[in-house]
């Protein structure tokens, strides 16, 4: 016989197969009750990881719409920053214990989830962490095809070049037992020709950094061509020097006749074992 926690996770997983990002708060709240949680609040981080933004349609225990929170000045933000469970009590729900749990995909911080639990203890924390892990995976799986999510995590519109590059970049953070990768790009909303890429191939880590001249659309397109050429040739097993030559050739083929050499990117490719 399955436990309450197992039923909650299994039911949520089954329910979300044909649901979108907009359905996630409702489905999580419904199935979390089976695990003993009386109230659920899901927040995701914005592009610059300065704010925690609630998924739409959620309300606090008093029935008020959830507000955006600063990461550097709130208890949910502390859970996000410290990557640990933060305990407090709900001010709207008669002091019910409230757990703030980070949403993680590996080491990438997605946001936080707040869970009100009338009974606090080790089992409750374990169930909260399990639920948070599943919710994080669902956010990751639903966000690539959700325009509402893309709008939610942007404090202002992206430039066209930033739109191109953000959709090509790998996650900003990755870690396993042997290596940690952590990245950041600024200005996040106006980045032009700056980009990075990395990938594991067995025990080998490939890292590439691109810097096309300028901050306009042409710089973003040049960097995207460089990244695609790098990936394509890297996947086919080419050596570093040959990858660099392939990047240069791809940019030359795609550049209009007479375009200045300054529009080509500087690139750094590295491989570590």
Regions inferred by a protein language model and the residue ranges of each:
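A short, aliphatic-rich beta-strand micro-motif
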Residues: 86-90, 94-105
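Amphipathic alpha-helical "output/dimerization" segments
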Residues: 121-140, 224-228
């Amino acid at each position: 016989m399955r436990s309450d926690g197992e039923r909650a996770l299994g039911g949520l997983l089954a329910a979300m197969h044909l649901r979108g990002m907009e359905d996630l708060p409702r489905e999580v709240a419904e199935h979390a009750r089976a695990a003993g949680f009386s109230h659920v609040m899901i927040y995701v981080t914005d592009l610059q990881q300065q704010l925690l933004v609630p998924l739409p349609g959620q309300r606090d225990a008093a029935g008020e719409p959830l507000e955006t929170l600063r990461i550097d000045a709130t208890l949910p933000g502390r859970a996000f920053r410290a990557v640990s469970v933060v305990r407090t009590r709900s001010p709207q729900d008669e002091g019910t214990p409230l757990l703030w749990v980070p949403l993680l995909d590996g080491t990438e911080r997605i946001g936080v989830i707040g869970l009100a639990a009338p009974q606090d203890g080790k089992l409750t924390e374990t169930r909260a962490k399990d639920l948070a892990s599943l919710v994080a995976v669902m956010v990751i799986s639903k966000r690539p095809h959700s325009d509402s999510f893309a709008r939610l995590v942007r404090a202002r519109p992206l430039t066209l070049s930033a739109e191109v590059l953000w959709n090509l970049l790998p996650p900003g953070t990755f870690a396993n037992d042997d290596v940690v990768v952590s990245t950041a790009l600024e200005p996040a909303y106006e980045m032009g020709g700056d980009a990075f890429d990395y990938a594991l191939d067995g025990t080998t880590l490939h890292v590439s950094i691109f810097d096309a001249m300028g901050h306009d659309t042409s710089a973003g397109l040049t960097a995207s061509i460089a990244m695609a050429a790098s990936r394509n040739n890297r996947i086919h097993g080419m050596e570093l020097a040959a990858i660099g030559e392939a990047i240069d050739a791809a940019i030359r083929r795609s550049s209009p006749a007479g375009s200045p050499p300054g529009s080509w990117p500087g690139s750094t490719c590295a491989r570590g074992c």
